Amino acid sequence: RQKNSEGNMNEEPINSDISLGGEYELNGNTFEFTINPDFSQVEADQSKININSTTALRFEERRIFFNEGKDFLSSDLSTVYTRSINNPDYAMKVYNRGEKHSYYFLDAEDAQTPIIVPGYQRSYSGLLGKSHANIFSYNYNIEKGQNIGFLATNRDFEEGGNSSLFSLKGNFLFNEIYNTRFELVSTAMDEPISDVINTTNVSKEHTYNLDGESFEGYGGVFGISRDTENWSTRYYFATKSPNYRSDLGFTTENNWKKHSVEHKYKYRSDGFVRKGNVEIRKDLMQDYDGVIIDLSLIHI
């Protein structure tokens, strides 16, 4: 406080916000909620800028509320990025880790909504007003680490419009040495109308501005591997189509396909040379016109 011209101390208004949160467990279900939470410890991240980056920066989730249960939301395509729920007025979630069935549901109202518009090898970002977010995940555990599950997300914007995402994924084992996994994603976008992004750049079919356009996209992952005592062979494919958007996920680039092939020999012995590895891997990334974005060949 400072003194005024009469020598008395100026009285400054006290700003106070009440936060409320809790956690309850019942019959294997965990329920958590937070109202008007104080997440000031993550605000410093918003000021970090990399002038050499043409895409939005990804920050680690450090908020305990969102970290608990995040394994339900794992995805090779980053279909859920909880930092996209930036400044919630409230958030609640319920989840259950059953032996066979597991599920997770989150509902949140965001006061300030970050949005990332992905493009070809770059992205555009801005901060919108309020939005309402829902996330639901279900997983069925089979045996020996095998599982199948699905995920759905939805976000409604105060400015109008909404975005949704649906995914199906699974992991399976065959003959003890073959493993395959997949993830199929469908996205739909009805853009809000806002001037928080202003660029003259466009894609083949749409602008990058938020001008009320509607479109759908898709993404996918497929991997297969064979592992024996000495040999390991893997193939991996991932893609995001030119119209892929995941507003509750983290997507800074679309219009790409990636292939990766790896072959490894593992040497193990009780002799003088106990172990060693020989590996060769080739990675190829292309856009949907067949143009090579990246190509690498690695020998180890």
Say what each PLM segment does.
Residues 20-24, 92-96, 136-140, 168-172, ...:
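Residues on the lipid-exposed face of transmembrane beta-strands in outer-membrane beta-barrel proteins
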Residues 1-139, 149-150, 160:
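Structural preference for beta-rich elements and adjacent junctions enriched in aromatics
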Residues 87-89, 163, 174-298:
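Exposed, low-structure sequence patches enriched in small/polar residues
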